Amino acid sequence: GPNRSKTPLQPDTIMIYNGKVYVLDAKLYRYGYSGNPNHLPNGPDINKQITYGEYIERTKGVPSENLYNAFIMPFNREDNTFFEMGADGNPISRITDNIGNIGEAVGDWKPNPKNYERVQGIVIDTRFLMYNYIGMPDQQKRQLAEAIEKVETRAPVPRPAT
């Protein structure tokens, strides 16, 4: 067959803020509007995000405690059924902000996952995104970073059932 060149790993967006690196996958995952689990990022998406983190840690020397992963999903802040998740993994309050953390995706093949191996699910209000398309002010970068860093307060990932 014809020769094909392999494309290198290229994450959607990398945000560097306060000395930390955030690998962001921002596609139109419909979960932010539908709430349907079938509209969440799937296994290959999760694997790819974890691979990006491994690559950055290994080749760029970024310490794992300063490296995070997140799926960014659009949602409607004014009309949503999402709840912020507490450190124990239980819902605590409805998301009323422009940015919220709705959970995480992990690979069950990773015992004791590093922060970047626990891919955070972040919703961002679509109207807010449109108004901040050109550049995100530091206040919003801080808000996004804080939402992603909630991984540090979550309980350990339970072992997979066998």
Question: What is the predicted function of each stretch?
Answer:
Residues 1-162:
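Catalytic core segments in nucleotide and nucleic-acid processing enzymes
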